[in-house]
From Swiss-Prot:
Protein name: Serine proteinase inhibitor 2
Keywords of the record: Host cytoplasm, Host-virus interaction, Inhibition of host caspases by virus, Modulation of host cell apoptosis by virus, Protease inhibitor, Thiol protease inhibitor
Subcellular location: Host cytoplasm
Molecular function (Gene Ontology), one example: serine-type endopeptidase inhibitor activity
Disulfide bond positions: none
Gene Ontology CC annotation, any one: host cell cytoplasm
Function: Viral serpin that inhibits both cysteine and serine proteinases involved in the regulation of host inflammatory and apoptosis processes. Major anti-apoptotic protein which inhibits both intrinsic and extrinsic pathways and strongly cleaves host CASP1 and CASP8 but is a rather poor inhibitor of host CASP3. Prevents the proteolytic activity of host interleukin-1-beta converting enzyme (ICE) and ICE-like enzymes. Can also block apoptosis through host tumor necrosis factor (TNF) receptor.
Length: 341
């Protein structure tokens, strides 16, 4: 959750949507080639072995590592990467097209292009992780109940949205009171082993303080506090795309020896290399029938419950988390600006 908090704090008033597993996969690839303090800092974000290969019918992931054909990579690094490694000519313009096409096909056309510009001839390695998610609601919203509804961007600004509604169904829900604010939390299940958890502050302008305290520990505590109850649910239909250079956010989180000339990647190849960029692109579509989401990340390496309510109306900024039944967070986002979908 810390990467989400850092990005959200730097993009006030904007929609945010990221995929932690996609980011973690690329950082893990970098970790395989890192040494010294660079490896020590990256170790915090290394993908746990238990989280690998957890793709199911709704969520799938792909990792690819492209290395410059003339570079000499160390055997220990290549063994860890395995079949995901491929040598290419980064000076050939067709290479970018081929990489973009690979991500485009995997994400069902939702991330295209991943790379907007030709790669530098100094590029030694390109690490890519793409994820794709599409799942039907266990209890779909009836389209006939969707209607225009005011969404309060702020206490003084309102925008009409297409609000989906469902009445009298049972969902896990809690009203939470914390020192930093009060909010409601609800879990909307998908068919299979995933669900969307929505965190809605009681106050229209109360989201920022909740974001600042959104940790993995707190999120688990809030989810554990939910109980099943009959409730009317109102959630906007929305589509959000995102494009982020994660370097600044990750440096602020302590990865000061990972990017630029300070990075030690002596376990990757025999020449001095640096990580100059880390791009993360995302897409999500939430509608009456299903949620569809995708994300791709690439790193360029160069030389407590209280009173129970009976309505959950997301008519002002909220946080949403798509998670697996085992608790693994697949995506996390903030919806606060309908006009920038």
């Amino acid at each position: 959750m810390d990467i989400f908090r850092e990005i959200a704090s730097s993009m006030k008033g904007e929609n945010v949507f990221i995929s932690p597993p996609s980011i973690s996969s690329v950082l893990t690839i970098l970790y395989y080639g890192a040494n010294g303090s660079t490896a020590e800092q990256l170790s915090k974000y290394v993908e746990k072995e238990a989280d690998k290969n957890k793709d199911d019918i709704s969520f799938k992931s792909m990792n690819k590592v492209y290395g410059r054909y003339s570079a000499v990579f160390k055997d220990s690094f290549l063994r860890k990467i395995g079949d995901n490694f491929q040598t290419v000519d980064f000076t050939d313009c067709r290479t970018v097209d081929a990489i973009n096409k690979c991500v485009d096909i995997f994400t069902e056309g939702k991330i295209n292009p991943l790379l907007d510009e030709p790669l530098s001839p100094d590029t030694c390695l390109l690490a890519i992780s793409a994820v794709y998610f599409k799942a039907k609601w266990l209890m779909p919203f009836e389209k006939e109940f969707t209607s225009d509804y005011p969404f309060y961007v702020s206490p003084t600004e309102m925008v009409d949205v297409s609000m989906m509604s469902m009445y009298g169904e049972a969902f896990n829900h809690a009203s939470v009171k914390e020192s930093f604010g009060n909010f409601s939390i609800i879990e909307l299940p998908y068919v299979g082993d995933t669900s969307m958890v929505v965190i809605l502050p009681d106050n229209i302008d109360g989201l920022e303080s909740i974001e600042q305290n959104l940790t993995d520990t707190n999120f688990k505590k809030w989810c554990d506090s939910m109980d099943a109850m009959f409730i009317d649910v109102h959630i906007p239909k929305f589509k959000v795309t995102g494009s982020y250079n994660l370097v600044d956010a990750l440096v602020k989180l302590g990865l000061t020896e990972v990017f630029g000339s300070t990075g030690d990647y002596s376990n990757m190849c025999n020449s001095d290399v640096s990580v100059d960029a880390m791009i993360h692109k995302t897409y999500i579509d939430v509608n009456e029938e299903y949620t569809e989401a995708a994300a791709a990340t690439c790193a360029l390496v160069a030389d407590c419950a209280s009173t129970v309510t009976n309505e959950f109306c997301a008519d002002h900024p909220f946080i949403y988390v798509i998670r697996h039944v085992d608790g693994k967070i697949l995506f996390v986002g903030r919806y606060c600006s309908p006009t920038t979908n």
